[in-house]
Swiss-Prot record:
Keywords: Cytoplasm, Endonuclease, Hydrolase, Metal-binding, Nuclease, Ribosome biogenesis, rRNA processing, Zinc. Single strand-specific metallo-endoribonuclease involved in late-stage 70S ribosome quality control and in maturation of the 3' terminus of the 16S rRNA. One of its GO terms (biological process) is rRNA processing. It is found in: Cytoplasm. It comes from Bacteroides fragilis (strain ATCC 25285 / DSM 2151 / CCUG 4856 / JCM 11019 / LMG 10263 / NCTC 9343 / Onslow / VPI 2553 / EN-2). Binds 1 zinc ion. It is an enzyme of class 3 (hydrolase). This is Endoribonuclease YbeY. Zn(2+) binds at residues 107, 111, 117. GO terms for molecular function: metalloendopeptidase activity; RNA endonuclease activity; zinc ion binding. InterPro entries: MetalPrtase_cat_dom_sf_prd, YbeY. Belongs to the endoribonuclease YbeY family. It comes from the Bacteria. GO terms for cellular component: cytoplasm.
Length: 139
């Protein structure tokens, strides 16, 4: 089982793949989950808009789209991340780009672990889970 990192039409972000993979596995383990096949696809705003329209019938830009292929406690999915939106968000929230990128990377994993962020009170739960995961990365 593996975590892969790919790009579509853009330069690969400067992330430490081995460390990031180990961090993702550690976060998943806190939810009693194992990694199956996870593919991160880093892309542009235009690509994520295309994916959003084609597969979700949403006509807007977003930072991440997670396609869930999980089976039991094994996490599998395709996670599209717009690096342009991540950069915009880091500026808007006045956070370092690297931190915002890792927040987005783990956000998709947390969705695969069953954490939602659309209903009442769910955004706060997701944000707390993201902060806990980011703290694990810094240790």
């Amino acid at each position: 089982m593996a975590i892969t990192y790919q790009t579509e039409g853009i330069k690969m972000p400067d992330i430490k793949k081995r460390e990031t993979t180990e961090w993702i596995k550690a976060v998943a383990a806190t939810y009693e989950k194992r990694i199956g096949e996870i593919a991160y696809i880093f892309c542009s705003d235009e690509k994520i808009l295309e994916v959003n329209r084609q597969y979700l019938q949403h006509d807007y830009y977003t930072d991440i789209i997670t396609f869930d292929y999980c089976e039991g406690n094994r996490l599998s999915g395709d996670l599209f991340i717009s690096l342009e939106t991540v950069k915009t968000n880091s500026e808007q929230f006045n956070t370092p780009y690297e931190e915002e990128l890792h927040r987005t990377i783990i956000h998709g994993i947390l969705h695969l672990c069953g954490i939602n962020d659309k209903g009442p009170g769910e955004r706060e739960i997701m944000e707390a889970a993201e902060n806990k995961a980011l703290a694990m990365r810094k240790q």
